[in-house]
């Protein structure tokens, strides 16, 4: 059991939020572009992409018993800063001390074989970037994207993290809060997932368009059964 699994006195939600608010005010002086995670309502994620990210994390036994500790933290506004880059997540999380903890998470890029398989199976099924972002695509693509170990979302062995807190747990609640915060970020911009996993999202759309164009060009010289021949035209008009 880690240090922070012990109960050293109850701290109310209001007290936690007040501590986070004070830290936020202090950080804004040196970080004017700070990006806190703000959860409206009880649901941490509301869109298909955000929910899929969280569901993926919760589906693995490695995380199932630990990640829940981060839910209350992210809801209480403890994730003061969260930024997603290519292959990396940077965050500041308000913990029990006055100084926020620094969390760094590395995400492995999606391997080329899996990406090629996904783009191939997406053939003609995603018609626009808007359709992809909104999560409005065929059910079979949902299964493809969320496949464990072979989908778009990272498996535990592809997630590497470090927190500056003294908690000895492999997955502390500060890291867990950040991982849930990513789900909230994907609600706002699902394309961040493609950047995070270094996937060229335009390939999905371009391949669909290219395949459609190729199909149209192949069929361009084929005579349609609905076309009317010259002799039929004469018969039609009684000539």
Residue ranges of model-derived segments:
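Long, low-complexity, compositionally biased intrinsically disordered regions
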Residues: 1-239
